[in-house]
Amino acid sequence: MSDKEPVISVHDLPLTFKVKYLGKQPAKGLWGMKHTRKPVEYMVAAAKNLPPHVILPIVRLTINRDGIQFVNITDKAVKSESIRFSVDAISYGVQDLVYTRVFSMIIVTDDSLDNGVPFECHSFVCESKDQARRITYALAACFQDYGRKVKLDGKERAIKKFAIDLRTPEEQAAASDGETEA
């Protein structure tokens, strides 16, 4: 970790960010940049093709010990429902390597494959690449706290796997040169 990397611990949570909601798309896998790239490309292309008077929804994104929630604050006159994802439903979080202002996460929507693809990629456009990085580190702190609680709990439970990619976009790009979808 470089000197410029944000240091965020569970004691810093909750953290709230004002970002734009890029949207959600099906993801083909549980974790890994290879499962967020195509959904992000699709959502960015769709956003670029929006009519001039249409903007992406502005949301208040909050990361706490229990997970992530966001609520649309674009039109303050309309009360929007908060969308929540518990930490055990989030399998992956990453700052995009191409669009460095984009933070994406993979959500496990269903534990079975009976209903098609059980994973969704949700993406947010941040004010800066540093903000996208802070969101990634905040989610990492949330994951660490969840792991600590599971260990302390000591009960038998189904093991849920999750990952957070803390590499910089440059490090991700260097590592992905040999990565394929096969």
Predicted segments, located by residue:
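Non-catalytic membrane-recruitment/adaptor modules and adjacent regulatory linkers
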Residues: 1-182
